[in-house]
Amino acid sequence: MGIVFDDRTPAIDQYSFPLCSELSGRELILVAPKKKYTLKFEDDTLLTFSESGTAGCRCLKLADQLYFVTIGQNSTVAVIDLKERLATLVMPDMGYAFCAIEQDWKALPETRHCETDELVGTGLRWNFGSEFYSKQVYFSVDRCRMTWSPENYRFDNFPARYTRIREKVYLVDINARVPAGSYVPRGYDRFFMLQDYDKLLFVGAAFSIDDAAPLMLSGFGETDDLDPTLFGDD
């Protein structure tokens, strides 16, 4: 197991989900409270974003009509829910935008994705491969404890943010250092994971401070016998 490049897309190869092309050719208008954004998917690997122009993109599908999209290489991502006509944009200079998706002749949905504390007090082991996993403890609304195999005895405390996407589906955003010896190359320091707690599956990406291509992530979760002291807010 290691890093594989498929059409110049780095990913952890063992449990890597295939890239999704279902958004190719579509143009989406995302409506935030004070602004509109446009995402035009030129093809499977290229889109035009109204905020930054044309950029490379990669798309992973987590569930029916639910997609995780990377935009360029600077920690810009979108979670697109076509079923509920909702979207979340994360942009390094502008933060989060919780949006509705325009559709001709239809009113905008009243609900939006939102920040949540529903994960607080929970923890799981997320498996990227048979020998590579991350244990994560969501002990407060803005912090998590994380460890990587093989050094799973050492938990570090990192800034985190949790967004509710659907019932039991969340976007987890962690600013984390990768320890030496991990399968993730050094330099990747921001991790997005779109997590389904019913199916215990996830998709996402890691972004690098060195402006390298996003590292696509996917796999499955499982419960783990975590030390109760890890859940304390100290």
Regions found by a protein language model. Give the residues of each.
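Large eukaryotic, non-enzymatic subunits of multiprotein complexes that serve as scaffolds/tethers
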Residues: M1-D13, Y96-A97
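N-terminal helix-cap/turn-to-beta initiation motif at the start of protein domains
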Residues: I12-E27, P109-G123
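Contiguous, well-ordered beta-strand patches that form the walls/edges
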Residues: E51-I80, E151-K199
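Extracellular beta-propeller repeat domains
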Residues: D44, A55, G72-E84, P92-G95, ...
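Short, hydrophobic/aromatic-rich segments at coil-to-beta transitions
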Residues: E22-I29, D44-T48, L62-V69, L119-R125, ...
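Surface-exposed beta-loop interaction hotspot
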Residues: T88-S130
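Helix-rich interaction surfaces within compact, conserved domain-sized segments
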Residues: R85-W105, K199-L200, G204-M216, F220
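N-terminal glycine/threonine-rich, aromatic-flanked beta-hairpin/loop signature
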Residues: I29-L60, S130-T163
